[in-house]
Regions:
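Acyl-donor (CoA/ACP) binding surface of acyl/acetyltransferases
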Residues: 1-28, 32-39, 73-193
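A short helix-loop-beta-strand connector motif used in the catalytic cores of GNAT acetyltransferases and
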Residues: 60-75
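Conserved GNAT-fold acetyl-CoA-binding loop/helix
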Residues: 41-60
Length: 193
């Protein structure tokens, strides 16, 4: 039986380490989200009524999704602490993966989401059959839009968001990077391990 290729479980990227979520991340995840609710709620529908049970369900779902290849969720670790999360998600059709990210309110404007996304781009294009990566965000979430722009993604359209955000207008900005364009993503000191 041939194993399905998957991204690395641990990736070091400059000032951050991306690490596949584990069950023992429960307390750190809950704390990071809870401390950042005012920052996350406008843009992340899942943060609306976040509880310990929400965190536990997310971690259990993350393990299942990783196993079936539908989603690869990582904790963003910096200075020894969980500072956010990022994902590669197989929900934009054949040949594509979507990147999602969030960071703790105290960790914004430090380049963590950009570094994490650069690492995920590299991982995505190591997987067979992936020819494009997309980032989709509400058009009013200007901070989120800076990430794909810095990484050389191209805005390819606007569409209604499947899950509108409380702070947004429901219009999703779609950014795309193709395998051929991926050389434009800086190295950011990425090491798999």
């Amino acid at each position: 039986m041939t194993e399905r290729p998957e991204p690395d479980e641990v990736i070091t990227c400059g000032q951050v380490t991306l690490r596949r979520y584990r069950e023992d991340d429960l307390d750190a995840l809950l704390q990071a989200v809870t401390e950042s609710l005012d920052h996350l709620r406008p843009w992340m529908p899942w943060a609306a009524n976040y509880t310990r049970q929400s965190a536990a369900e997310f971690l259990a779902r993350s393990a299942r999704d990783w196993a079936d290849g539908s989603e690869y969720n990582y904790a963003i670790i910096t200075d020894g602490a969980l500072a956010g999360g990022c994902s590669l998600m197989a929900r934009i059709g054949p040949g594509g993966l979507e990147i999602g990210y969030w960071v703790h309110r105290a960790c914004t404007r430090r380049g963590l989401a950009t570094a994490a996304s650069a690492a995920l781009v590299e991982q995505a294009f190591r997987l067979p059959g992936v020819d494009r990566v997309e980032i989709i965000h509400d058009e009013l979430n200007v901070a989120s839009g800076r990430v794909p722009r810095k990484l050389g993604f191209t805005e390819v359209g606007r569409q209604p968001l499947s899950e509108p955000t409380p702070g947004g207008n429901g219009v999703g900005v779609v950014w795309r990077l193709t395998r051929l364009q991926s050389g434009s993503v800086g190295r950011h000191g990425i090491r798999a391990g």
